[in-house]
Amino acid sequence: DEKILIHVSNFRPVKRVPDVIKIFSVVRKTLPSKLILVGDGPERSECERLCRELGITEYVKFMGKQDSLPEILSIADLFIMPSQSESFGLSALEAMSCEVPVISSSVGGLPELNLHGKTGYIAEFGDVERMAKYAIELLSNEKKYQLFQKNARARAEIFKDEKIIGDYEKFYEKILSE
């Protein structure tokens, strides 16, 4: 049973896409899995090179920009968001609304959205080993995984209202710019 890990971003340094690839590389050694990378941006070619370097090219799919994110998220088992800066984490919220648990960094609004040990796991940004460990732990425990799926969906429902999301984004941008 192959696991699908996913990351969605603009491939800018702040999103730490190389960390996503390194996390996946560790997970892949333990669990049969694939990585889907959605989006495009300045670090894409570096990320493609890293996949070649790690010998995982055949397991990583670069999808470019996509319009139908829910369709892609519906096949995912885990959403990886190791950003070093994030105001809110809308793509993580979208994943959670599709019952996809999240492994994220602890920056910006992510800890408010992704509840550690309930909807996914949180680690310090840059801690590739810990994020990989959490991913393996969650994907290896079906009972816990199903609970996290339900929790992620329920948590996303709280934030679903467009107005709330807009308010949170403004709030976090204000806080982060101070």
Regions found by a protein language model. Give the residues of each.
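Conserved acidic donor-binding segment of nucleotide-sugar-dependent glycosyltransferases
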Residues: 116-117, 121-128, 137-142
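Short hydrophobic beta-strand element within catalytic cores of glycosyltransferases
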Residues: 101-104, 114
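A short alpha->beta transition loop at the rim of the catalytic pocket in nucleotide-sugar-dependent
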Residues: 70, 77, 99
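C-terminal alpha-helical cap of glycosyltransferases
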Residues: 161-178
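Short glycine/serine-rich donor-binding loops of glycosyltransferases
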Residues: 89-92, 110
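A conserved nucleotide-sugar
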Residues: 2-6, 17-62, 144
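A short, well-ordered alpha-helix in the C-terminal region of glycosyltransferases
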Residues: 130, 137, 144-158, 170
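Aromatic "clamp/platform" in nucleotide-sugar-dependent glycosyltransferases that forms part
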Residues: 65, 84
